[in-house]
Amino acid sequence: MEISGWGRYPKIDAEVILPKTGSACASALKDPGLLIPRGLGRSYGDSSLASTVLETTELQYFQEFDPETGALACDAGVSLYEILNVFIPQGWFLPVTSGTRFVTVGGAIASDIHGKNHHVDGTFCEHVLSFDIALGNGEIVTASPTQNLDLFHATCGGMGLTGIIIAARIRLKPITSSDILETTIKAPNLDAVLDGFEKYIGSTYSVAWIDCLAKGADLGRSLLMIGEHATDGGLKVSSKKPITIPMDAPTQLLNPLTIKAFNALYYGKVLQTEQSRRTSFETYFYPLDQMLHWNRLYGKPGFLQYQFVIPTATGREGMRRILEEITESGQGSFLAVLKAFGKQNENYLSFPVEGYTLALDFKVTPSIFKLLDRLDELVLQYGGRLYLAKDARMTELTFKASYPRWQEFEAVRSKYHAIGKFASLQSKRLGLA
């Protein structure tokens, strides 16, 4: 069957295996040949693509929950959406969440997802107590911060290349309201929004929408959104049905003129320098989940999400230079999200380092690849790197120059029988065995 990542580029024909139990996952590994595990397919590029794909979505059961500690044990195919639906009414929330709820627990670990609170709470895997993983030889073992630590650090952020996560134990955090108290600050330029991140470093959540086509004195103008959990107002999950994008949009829908017009309207909708509101967790964390199949907006060719991080020391200069490159190209991004990262963790391939990260969506066109190659050069020049969960075209040279622990990662893969069993289109492109 034809499959792709969320960006719908590239698309390939693959054999898809759907085991219903962890032991069935392990049994599937006895067959010769390479494969890659896959959850709900929300990584954007080719990290979960291979000629043989093992989907974990049938591993979908909750196992145990401790209301005293918030420790949840569940199958790896359980989604963040399902966790929120079950546990928000009981007063619990995810410790870290990505910009979509439609991610499996296994996928969240494999990508070591981050959220709007990285500067406070780190990545998802920093709240993982342990997981069970089927190795390339069919053995099922447990990895945690106290057991098989090297396997734990390699699997967290390891893009499914160490084995098949079949179950996990994570720690949820208590809340007394499902609502978010949001303050939006209008930042007239890049320096102002980066100053805002520093000013609100003690806030639990922070994220900025950035106008990537603004030039001159307006370069980097943004809306910075600060969030805190409300303490009253009930614990509820919306029953409102999302709208559906029914078909591919015309390829000319998103172009520099429409993006520029949208950006002007979006920035202009905030009339005051600072304004506050109470909003639902769905609106604050998952605005795009309100549109099913929103990836169709980019048309049949698909799109590339380009997310990079630049360390704090070079962050301002690097961000400015990259934004200038984008505005000069005229190839703007319809969605541009800026966040501040806290300290780096010990996982070999986890993306975040302390600094600033920007995520951009670009429609697939013949000219976009040249621009992204140029942005790669700038990211490396300023000491940054790209997010593997979003990547579909990074070179081996760029990867190995920006992820200095890749050889340690490969050594752990060899130790735990992953080499010769787990591989994706991405891992082959990046020169991993």
List each model region and its residues:
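Noncatalytic alpha-helical scaffold of FAD-dependent oxidoreductases
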Residues: 1-433
